[in-house]
């Protein structure tokens, strides 16, 4: 997997304008939609149980995010996910805050048990808690703790039969056999709410157009990280408000040439 291959997926997303169905949380809906539009994808936010199965059927990818968790949204996620499975639409799951409460953890484990996932993405604590591995968590944004992140990612990929993505200072992508590290991004991303949730939806746009899911995720993470770096160069001294706006600009303006120039990936043995 080389940077030229990775960069081509960015162009493919913009050429294809994939429809990404998001059942996401109320905190990030606007930011997620604008980020996908800036990238060149088409977002739809459909939550009603009466329509989610039909909407998932016509989407290029389905993103399930449990940030603001309510029983009616869990029901909608299950309906949409099962419809997506029947119609070969890739399902992405973001188990926000898994491990923070017993209810949240129960849902985070129930969804992969009921739905075949193409991708699961979270921080190390979230992914560890989904597969019932011990990892301390404090709040929905906790990602630090003790443990081997690559090992946890590989275990999750094997147990859930999916591509596991753990994001943090370094991002880990694995299907249990191929494992890739991505070293792009900027710390200011953690000062803007919803950047992780948007990332999962951006990955959705990439897997909608590239069926090699490891390659698709690596391309999405590299693109996202490079866009953040370019935005930070212009705005980091001004603060997170300016960064958020410039980041949307860079999601629109970051090119495949930028990916080839600034992308930092490493394939592990």
Curated annotation (Swiss-Prot):
Reaction(s) catalysed (UniProt annotation): 5-(2-hydroxyethyl)-4-methylthiazole + ATP = 4-methyl-5-(2-phosphooxyethyl)-thiazole + ADP + H(+)
Record pathway: Cofactor biosynthesis; thiamine diphosphate biosynthesis; 4-methyl-5-(2-phosphoethyl)-thiazole from 5-(2-hydroxyethyl)-4-methylthiazole: step 1/1
Cofactor: Mg(2+)
EC code: 2.7.1.50
InterPro entries: Hyethyz_kinase, Ribokinase-like
UniProt-listed Gene3D superfamilies: 3.40.1190.20
UniProt: ATP binding residues: 121, 167
Annotated GO biological process: thiamine biosynthetic process; thiamine diphosphate biosynthetic process
Keyword tags: ATP-binding, Kinase, Magnesium, Metal-binding, Nucleotide-binding, Thiamine biosynthesis, Transferase
Recorded GO MF terms: ATP binding; hydroxyethylthiazole kinase activity; magnesium ion binding
Binding residue positions for substrate: 45, 194
SUPFAM superfamilies associated with the record: Ribokinase-like (SSF53613)
Domain of life: Bacteria
Pfam families: HK
Chain's role: Catalyzes the phosphorylation of the hydroxyl group of 4-methyl-5-beta-hydroxyethylthiazole (THZ).
HAMAP family xrefs: Thz_kinase
Family under the similarity heading: Belongs to the Thz kinase family.
Protein's name according to its UniProt entry: Hydroxyethylthiazole kinase
Gene responsible for this protein: thiM
């Amino acid at each position: 997997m080389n940077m030229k291959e990775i960069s081509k997926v960015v162009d493919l997303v913009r050429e294809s304008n994939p429809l990404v169905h998001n059942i996401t949380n109320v905190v990030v809906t606007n930011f997620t939609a604008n980020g996908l539009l800036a990238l060149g994808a088409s977002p739809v936010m459909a939550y009603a149980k009466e329509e989610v199965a039909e909407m998932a059927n016509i989407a290029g990818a389905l993103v399930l995010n449990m940030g603001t968790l309510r029983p009616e949204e869990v029901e909608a996620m299950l309906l949409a996910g099962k419809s997506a499975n029947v119609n070969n639409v890739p399902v992405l799951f973001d188990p926000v805050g898994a491990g923070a409460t017993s209810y949240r953890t129960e849902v985070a484990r129930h969804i992969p048990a009921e739905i075949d996932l193409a991708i699961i993405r979270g921080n190390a604590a979230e992914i560890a808690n989904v597969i019932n591995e011990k990892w301390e968590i404090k709040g929905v944004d906790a990602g630090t703790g003790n443990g081997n992140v690559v090992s946890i990612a590989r275990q999750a990929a094997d147990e859930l039969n999916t591509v596991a993505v753990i994001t943090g200072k370094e991002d880990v992508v694995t299907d249990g056999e191929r494992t890739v590290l991505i070293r792009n991004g900027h710390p200011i991303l953690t000062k803007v709410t919803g950047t992780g949730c948007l990332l999962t939806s951006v990955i959705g746009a990439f897997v909608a157009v590239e069926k090699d899911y490891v390659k698709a995720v690596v391309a999405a993470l590299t693109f996202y990280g490079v866009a953040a770096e370019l935005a930070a160069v212009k705005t980091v001294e001004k603060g997170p408000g300016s960064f958020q706006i410039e980041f949307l600009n860079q999601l629109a303006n970051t090119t495949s040439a930028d990916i080839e120039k600034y992308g930092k990936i490493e394939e592990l043995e």
